[in-house]
Design a protein with these regions (language model features):
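N-terminal secretory signal peptides that target proteins for export/translocation
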Residues: 1-5
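N-terminal acidic, glycine/proline-rich low-complexity segments
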Residues: 24-435
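Bacterial N-terminal signal peptides
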Residues: 7-19
Length: 435
């Protein structure tokens, strides 16, 4: 694979390039993988990245596809993409006998948690969390790579129910917006399982579709027109078949794909080394701030941190007080703690000012308003790795690695031509059987 970004090469040599880009020798052990996705939940990304993933299943030993959404995503959304893959499978299998049969993929597709975790971070076992435990306990010397593209509840539940599996796991977590929806499950893992091997990618993933070489057929829209549309059922589905919330996406986003390329190129065992997946630094103490009062915009917290608000329900509160913290497009359910106080958690995915309102059946809480300001982590944060998180990495906060204000995005987009070349080569396999 070239070590510096370049232009997409002519289509005739894509197949030759693919053999190099896959990174692993034909007989080398393939990495074991479970993908946890919120496909059908909050955005297009997962459907596009599922297409990418399925085209890579000759290189990966895929052991599970879990539906772990925030929102309306369900197992059936994954199965629909597998149905599209089934139409290309006759061609794909001529290029590599390692492509799994569609029925084999359907058999490992499981339903995970459909609700956000409560304050405790865990709720109950699910088919998805139990599948993680089952796979992790198999007699296999290879680590089990968990790619979390959506809610992290099933991973949290698996660790809660079977903490013995922790040494076997290697996790790449597309955090940021997903942490925003599921802060309690994330906080449970960070505080109760700090020895977990984890890449917490909060914003670097945005380099997949922001910045880098966008000239010619490398732009998000022109690449799809030139190298995706007309490339089998998967290509046509990607180029015009992904409808979500009344809109059809026809350009690249693929925001979960850095987790896939983590295992395709570079050294997966060393997140500090450059690669298509991004380049990460040891995590500093995971920011967690607690306020026992209504906050104001003068209160500053770190972007992607866990913000906790603790308020008394007041003397006239009902026997069973209820409350929600309404902030932007979220309505966060409060939890009454042992002392009777109401607790809320929130994670800001952007560096900006936020306003919130509390809705409650407790008169002292209902209608309260407040604010806070989220700020980007200081570059110096990377100089103080947390000894309590020995196997935890996150985005490089240095200005040199920012694309605009996107932290770490340049560690991904510098490779744009290379990872798009690899994707195009895989799509070529859908067009016709191997001669």
């Amino acid at each position: 694979v070239p070590t510096t970004p370049g232009r997409i090469l002519p289509i005739l040599v894509f197949g030759l390039l693919a053999a190099c880009a896959h990174g692993a020798a034909p007989d080398s052990p393939r990495p074991r993988v479970i993908v946890s996705t919120d496909a059908g939940g909050t955005d297009f990304d997962d459907f596009q990245s599922l297409v990418h993933l399925l085209l890579c299943t000759d290189t990966l030993d895929l052991e599970g596809l879990l539906s772990s959404p925030y929102g309306g995503g369900r197992k059936e959304h994954i199965l629909r993409v597998i149905d599209v893959y089934a139409r290309d499978y006759p061609n794909l299998r001529t290029h590599s006998a390692r492509y799994p049969a569609p029925d084999a993929l359907r058999a490992i597709t499981k339903q995970g948690e459909t609700e956000v975790a409560p304050y405790a971070g865990v709720r109950r076992p699910t088919e998805g969390s139990e599948w993680i435990v089952r796979c992790a306990r198999r007699d296999d010397p290879r680590p089990l790579h968990i790619l979390v593209w959506g809610g992290i509840e099933d991973l949290a539940q698996a660790l809660h129910d079977a903490p013995d599996i922790l040494p076997k796991l290697r996790v790449y977590y597309i955090g940021g917006p997903n942490k925003k929806w599921t802060p309690d499950a994330y906080h449970y893992i960070a505080t109760r399982h700090p020895a977990l091997w984890m890449i917490e990618c909060n914003e670097s993933y945005q380099g997949w579709f922001n910045g880098g070489d966008m000239s010619g057929d490398l732009a998000n829209d022109t690449f799809v027109q030139a190298h995706v549309a007309g490339h089998g059922a998967l290509g046509d589905y990607f180029a015009g078949g992904i409808a979500f919330q009344g809109t059809t996406r026809t350009a690249i986003r693929m925001g979960d794909s850095p987790a896939v390329t983590w295992l395709l190129q570079g050294n997966p065992a060393d997140p500090t080394q450059p690669g298509w997946r991004g380049q990460f630094v040891r995590a500093w103490p995971r920011p967690y701030v607690v306020f026992d009062r209504i906050t104001t915009p003068a209160d500053r917290i770190e972007q992607f941190s866990i913000f906790e608000l603790v308020l008394p329900p007041g003397a006239n509160a009902p026997a069973q007080p209820e409350a929600r913290l309404v902030i932007e497009n979220q309505s966060l359910v409060g939890t009454v703690d042992a002392a009777g106080a109401m607790r809320f958690r929130f994670s800001p995915k952007e560096a900006k000012a936020y306003r919130y309102t509390i809705r409650s059946n407790a008169p002292a809480l209902d209608g309260l308003t407040g604010g806070l300001t989220s700020v980007q982590p200081a570059p110096e944060a990377a100089l103080r790795p947390d000894p309590q998180l020995p196997n935890w990495w996150t985005d490089d906060p240095s200005p040199a690695q920012m694309e605009g204000r996107l932290i770490g995005a340049k560690t991904v987009n510098r490779w744009r031509a290379d990872f798009l070349r690899d994707f195009a080569a895989r799509l070529e396999r859908c067009r016709a059987p191997k001669p």
